[in-house]
From Swiss-Prot:
It comes from Bartonella henselae (strain ATCC 49882 / DSM 28221 / CCUG 30454 / Houston 1). InterPro entries: AAA+_ATPase, ABC_transporter-like_ATP-bd, ABC_transporter-like_CS, ABC_transpr_LolD-like, MacB-like_ATP-bd, P-loop_NTPase. Disulfide bonds: none annotated. Part of the ABC transporter complex LolCDE involved in the translocation of mature outer membrane-directed lipoproteins, from the inner membrane to the periplasmic chaperone, LolA. Responsible for the formation of the LolA-lipoprotein complex in an ATP-dependent manner. Gene3D superfamilies: P-loop containing nucleotide triphosphate hydrolases (3.40.50.300). GO terms for biological process: lipoprotein localization to outer membrane; protein localization to outer membrane. This is Lipoprotein-releasing system ATP-binding protein LolD. The gene is lolD.
Length: 226
């Protein structure tokens, strides 16, 4: 299998009191091409920190993040930003859509920032919204959408630039069980259809069991679950 994302001996320490607070300690992980992996761990275990490091939003205290075999350890902030824009998509528990723009515009904007022409960005955005069955709400602002619709638009935005990796932090955690299952099915179907590799943090073990692998955080290490 081809490794897309590798976390190598990752350490993350925070200063606190007389000794540092250790969140991650020589943590290792490989996400292979086309894999859908669940990150299952209790609140406060370090899931968000792990995702932020994997997504180059946060620098580890030590260790390296490898994306498609290339080290990111010594990349400048501008280089890390460019990698995020082109290769990494994010979905959060709360959608973070721009409230003043429509659903369609929210999916177009990151593409235009990346250099796509407006007409191409619009065409790509509509295709994604159609695939996620929310194109009929394309001209509505986020406040006019249901929670499930908001998350589907957020998913479309996350994959709009054609990333190789999708990272999701509790993407269904704020939804009711029925909507949660529907949004997860839409997300997993899109990941598989687009050939993405995804690491998804969730408290929902029933959803986690539907993924290829499951990992957790134990004693500041990444551990495989059955």
């Amino acid at each position: 299998m081809t490794a897309i994302l590798e976390l190598v001996e990752i350490e993350r320490h925070f200063l606190g009191g007389n000794k540092p607070l250790i969140i991650l300690d020589k943590a290792n992980f490989i996400l292979n091409r086309g894999e859908l992996v669940a990150l299952v761990a209790p609140s406060g275990a370090g899931k968000s920190t792990l995702l932020h490091i994997a997504g180059l939003l946060e620098k580890p205290t030590a260790g390296d993040v490898m994306l498609r075999g290339v080290s990111c350890a010594k990349r400048s902030d501008n280089e890390r930003t460019a990698i995020r824009q082109n290769d990494i998509g994010f979905v959060y528990q709360f959608h973070h859509l721009l409230p003043e723009f429509t659903a369609l515009e929210n999916v177009m904007i990151p593409q235009m920032i990346a250099g796509f022409k407006k007409s191409i960005a619009e065409e790509r955005a509509l295709k994604l919204l159609t695939y996620l069955r929310v194109s009929h709400r394309a001209n509505h602002r986020p406040s006019e959408l249901s929670g499930g619709e908001q998350q589907r638009v957020a998913i479309a935005r996350a994959v709009a630039n054609g990333p190789s990796v999708l990272l999701a932090d509790e993407p269904t955690g704020n939804l009711d069980p029925v909507t949660s299952a529907y949004v997860f099915q839409a997300l997993s179907a899109l990941v598989r259809q687009a050939g993405l590799s995804a690491l998804i943090a969730t408290h929902n073990y029933a959803l986690a069991k539907q993924m290829h692998r499951r990992i957790t955080l134990k004693e500041q290490k990444i551990v495989e679950l059955p």
